[in-house]
């Protein structure tokens, strides 16, 4: 409610004490503030009455003074009872802030000082609770490290002694030990044996580290509003803000360094990818090396197949077409030897046929080697050869069926060795006869 003063003097308004006045930039200023609020409605009525008559104004002023004195007594009682209640919750070891004595009769200043003192006590109590919670968090982390070291030792002992209940548990333990590096257990043990460092980050950037909280409680604190940084002033030796938060700055610096390295790696990878932007598959050097290792592992796995599969893959040489395997060439050589033994009358026919057949195969192989077909032509040629082989096999099966039927219908009358040789020679010639 605004106060309209039409006429009168300001002698009735009390002035603040000289000790409560302070400049905003001075460091020696006390914690008191001066709050000016508009006068209540009763004062306005008293001022109007004072303008009307001097005697009535004198009586009204005396009434106002009586009311102020009664309000003073009430605020004094409240300020005595409230700190007594709040001090019961506080720690007795915590130093209590000492209020500066002010020789002033203004109830507003006393009220403001009481509110500020209560707020300071509450702030100190909350700081103490925060420090206790941080100590509790340290203890929990320490217990976690102890349990991790104990678990690691149990797993190592179980692996060495193999006294587990079943094979599944043993297998799971071995898998866990393979996946988890030994450096994790060593790091946990070293962190447990060495001094447990404070890895907690402050909630606010103006928070004081808990290890220096108790030492700095009795010292003078001021806050620079422009920089928004706490300035700690000591009597013996002043130190900067960076020295005050040195235990916490190591972890933050490591985190910042790790982020910087990650960003540099990301930039390098983008540069490497930009170099190979025209290639169909974009890979950096590390990815190429990893791909080569995987392909090499696949080649090693393929080389460890069975001997039969190895023999089948051995005679399929890329770019040379179909070639006979070693076993098939041996079988053909044995057949040629048998034919030479059986062909007593006409040995030249089979030799000429075999030579011509070998010559044709060599010519075909030379032609295939000389001409380098494209991938599409190679696929067409392979399909054509496959169809030719299938048709040839079908024809051979038909001839064999016809020969078997002829043999069943016309049994041999003269079972002599010569006739048998001629018959076998004729059968083999029919089978090996090219289309």
UniProtKB/Swiss-Prot annotation:
Alphabetized InterPro entries for the sequence: Fsip1
Biased composition (Low complexity): 18-32
Polar residues composition-biased segments: 50-63
Annotated segments matching region Disordered: 1-109, 354-393
Keywords: Coiled coil, Phosphoprotein
Pfam name, any one: FSIP1
Bias (Basic and acidic residues): 64-87, 355-371, 378-393
Gene Ontology CC: one annotated term: nucleus
Phosphoserine: residues carrying this PTM: 87-88
Coiled coil start-end: 108-154
GO biological process, one term: single fertilization
Tissue: Detected in male germ cells and testis.
Quaternary structure and partners: May interact with AKAP4.
Family: Belongs to the FSIP1 family.
Name of protein: Fibrous sheath-interacting protein 1
Natural source organism: Mus musculus (Mouse)
Lineage of the species this protein comes from: Eukaryota, Metazoa, Chordata, Craniata, Vertebrata
Name of encoding gene: Fsip1
């Amino acid at each position: 409610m605004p106060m309209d003063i039409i006429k009168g003097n300001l002698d009735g308004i009390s002035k603040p004490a000289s000790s409560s006045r302070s400049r905003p930039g001075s460091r020696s200023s006390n914690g008191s503030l001066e709050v000016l609020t508009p006068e209540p409605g009763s004062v306005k009525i008293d001022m109007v009455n004072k303008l009307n008559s001097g005697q009535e104004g004198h009586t009204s002023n005396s009434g106002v003074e009586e009311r102020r004195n009664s309000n003073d007594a009430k605020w004094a009682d409240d300020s005595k009872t409230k700190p007594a209640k709040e001090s019961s919750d506080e720690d007795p070891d915590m130093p209590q802030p000492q209020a500066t004595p002010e020789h002033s009769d203004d109830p507003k200043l006393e009220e403001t000082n009481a509110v500020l003192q209560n707020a300071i006590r509450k702030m100190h109590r909350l700081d103490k609770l925060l420090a206790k919670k941080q100590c509790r968090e340290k203890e929990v982390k320490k217990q976690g490290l102890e349990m991790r070291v104990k678990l690691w030792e149990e797993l190592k002992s179980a692996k060495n002694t193999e006294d587990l209940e079943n094979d599944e548990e043993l297998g799971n333990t071995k898998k866990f030990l393979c996946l988890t590096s030994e450096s994790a257990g060593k790091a946990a043990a070293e962190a447990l044996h060495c001094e447990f460092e404070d890895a907690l980050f402050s909630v606010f950037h103006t928070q004081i580290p808990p290890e220096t909280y108790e030492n700095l409680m009795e010292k003078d604190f001021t806050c620079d509003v422009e920089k928004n940084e706490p300035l700690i002033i000591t009597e013996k030796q002043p130190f900067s803000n960076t020295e005050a938060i040195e235990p916490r700055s190591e972890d933050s610096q490591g985190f910042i360094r790790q982020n910087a390295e990650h960003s540099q790696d990301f930039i390098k990878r983008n540069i490497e990818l930009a170099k190979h932007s025209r290639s169909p598959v974009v890979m950096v050097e590390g990815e190429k090396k990893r791909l080569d290792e995987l392909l090499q592992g696949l080649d090693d796995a393929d080389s460890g197949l069975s001997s039969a599969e190895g023999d089948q893959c051995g005679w399929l040489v890329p770019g040379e077409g179909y070639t006979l395997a070693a076993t098939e060439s041996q079988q053909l050589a044995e057949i040629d030897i048998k034919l030479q033994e059986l062909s007593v009358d006409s040995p030249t026919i089979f030799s000429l046929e075999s030579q011509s057949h070998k010559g044709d195969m060599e010519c075909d192989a030379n032609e295939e080697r000389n001409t380098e077909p494209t991938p599409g032509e190679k696929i067409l040629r392979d399909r054509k050869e496959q169809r030719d082989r299938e048709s040839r096999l079908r024809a051979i099966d038909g001839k064999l069926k016809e020969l078997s039927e002829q043999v069943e219908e016309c049994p041999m009358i003269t079972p002599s060795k010569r006739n048998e040789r001629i018959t076998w020679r004729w059968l083999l010639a029919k089978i090996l006869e090219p289309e």
